[in-house]
Regions:
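Residues within mature, well-folded domains
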Residues: 2-161
């Protein structure tokens, strides 16, 4: 898990709320502090974070790991931010990308040749958490001379029946 500003701020908010609530039970400030420290992670991961996921598309970020990318495709959206920010794939060959990400799931449409192109690789990133999210996240790699020249993310709307 990548420690972000949002994660730290939300932990602080949960800690303050837990401390204020526990302080109403008794006046012993050291006991209230100790119980608040113990209760904060429990309250965060069992109450605050699930409620946050229901109403927003906030999610934790993870460091990119090639094994996790291939083993847990539904969690790829957590790793793609690091790939984009650090340009980890720019300049890599098709063989190197295939070794890290696996075979492309589909080829993108190229308007210039009016067909699917072997130079536009697409990967499904899964759905970000949220009760009202029907957007599937996707990653497209654009190759020039068999090396990655650009990458972009986009969303596909899925209809659930």
């Amino acid at each position: 898990m990548v420690i972000t500003t949002g994660l730290v701020l939300s932990f602080i908010v949960v800690f303050i709320l837990a401390w204020l609530f526990i302080k109403t039970i008794g006046n012993n400030k050291w006991l209230s502090l100790l119980v608040s420290i113990i209760a904060t992670p429990l309250l965060y991961f069992w109450m605050f974070y699930p409620m946050l996921n229901i109403f927003t598309s906030y999610h934790h970020q993870k460091y990119f790991n090639a094994e996790d990318w291939q083993e847990f495709p539904e969690l790829r959206y957590e790793m793609v931010d690091q790939i984009k920010q650090q340009n980890q794939l720019i300049g890599k060959t098709k063989q190197e990308v295939e070794a890290e990400l696996g075979e492309p799931e589909w080829f993108g449409w190229d308007e210039t040749i009016k067909a699917n192109s072997n130079d536009l690789w697409n990967y499904n990133l899964g759905f970000k958490p949220g009760a009202f999210n029907n957007q599937q996240e996707c990653l497209e790699l654009q190759f020039k001379n068999d090396t990655v020249a650009a990458l972009k993310t986009y969303q596909l709307e899925k209809k659930f029946e």
